[in-house]
Amino acid sequence: MSRPVYTLYCSPDSASFIVRLALRLTGAEFAERQIDRPSGELDSPAYRAMHPLGKIPAIETPDGPMFETAAILMYLAERHPGLAPAQGSAERAAFLKWYFYTVTNLHAPLMQVFYPERVAGAECAVAVVAHQATKLQEHFAILDQMVARDAPDWLSARPSIFSFYVGVMVRWLSGFPAGHPARLTTADLPALGPILAQLETCSAAQDVAKAEGCAPTIFTAAY
């Protein structure tokens, strides 16, 4: 058996889910190391040496350990052609601006909705969730409008780091109960919804769904 090119440190249905999907697209050999959160492994010296904040994911690569989901995805796309528009291609500029729009305006406020106490303490959690949930709804609507208008190949039913990144975030937001201000499903996204419905049927998505113990409808009926 060949030695894995990558080792992903992961936890079920966390941000490592996104990286796991991308790794499946690369076709490269990779190993998975499940983190024992209850035992405090995230705070262990060995893990903190890879990720100084003790968060998931982290990944060992041929160029050393990496952390931050968006950085890992970009690294994989640069090493494995086809996961994102190539440098110098006509689509590269549009891809980059919307990729970093997603990092800043979707992923960051999403994390604040799930962990509001990190922003301003437990006493302000309700206000933080309400504010950031409104921003999330607005920012997802802007992204959906762009997809309807431009139909970019890098955010389509063709698997890519961008489509999987957005899909997993919609997955998480769909897990909130009806009436929660941050709840968002594929039904709320006229352009993106059908794309994610197709995307979840690809082999990479189905393989990861099985490995994670999820229903095969990982984006459209996640929970």
Residues covered by each model-derived region:
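Active-site-flanking alpha-helical
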Residues: 77, 169-170, 209
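Structured helix-beta-strand junction loops
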Residues: 53, 79, 149-150, 202
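GST-like fold's C-terminal all-alpha helical module
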Residues: 102-198
